[in-house]
Amino acid sequence: NTTVDILAIGAHPDDAEIGCAGLLIKAKARGLRTGILVLTQGEMGTFGDPETRRAEAEAAARILQVDAFRILDLPDARLEFNYENTLRIVEVLREWRPRLLLSPHEDDHHPDHVATARLVERAAFLATRPALFPQYEPLIPQPRHLTFPLSFQRPLRPHFVLDITDVYGIKQQALQAHGSQYGPILFAVEIVARYYGMMIPAAYGEGFLTKSPHPLTDALGII
């Protein structure tokens, strides 16, 4: 059975690559198991059909060397925060059993990103309920949840920034795998990565936010 330590959940086939590819790469290098769950096939995007976008997402997942990858069939541009969609995520959480969840932040211009943040937060709680999907053990403890900004127009001030300078080249390769989507937007991704990097300081960074405190097991993690 496939299990992961860290699961990135995006509304569209390239969300995880934009927001947290660096974290996934660095986690994999430390021996952690990683996964990507995509909620829609991106069929309403300006460029690319669902088959193309699936192939591109699979290629990017191979570059990131994730241990688990899946694309659901929820409707692109009509992704709703409701119980039925939440249960689709809950089933994957119970199956893959992540300890840390990554998703877009809810303060975003795209309604699908807003819905994804709320769906993941609710699914993390419901995954602990024994009555749901009894074929799997309840996911206890509830996985922690970090969010990443996806809006180029208004990048948020993160609670912490991960230095991804040493793996930024691999992140770029994963983004370039989405050939139907990228070109000029790669420049925007780099600008945001440099913006977050300047905060720490580093050449490139990824920013993350949290609604609840995250425990430190080593005080050296903050210096």
Where are these regions (language model features)?
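Active-site rim/loop-helix segments in enzyme catalytic domains that contact anionic ligands
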Residues: N1-W96
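Metal-dependent de-N-acetylase/amidase catalytic core
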Residues: N1-I9, E80-I223
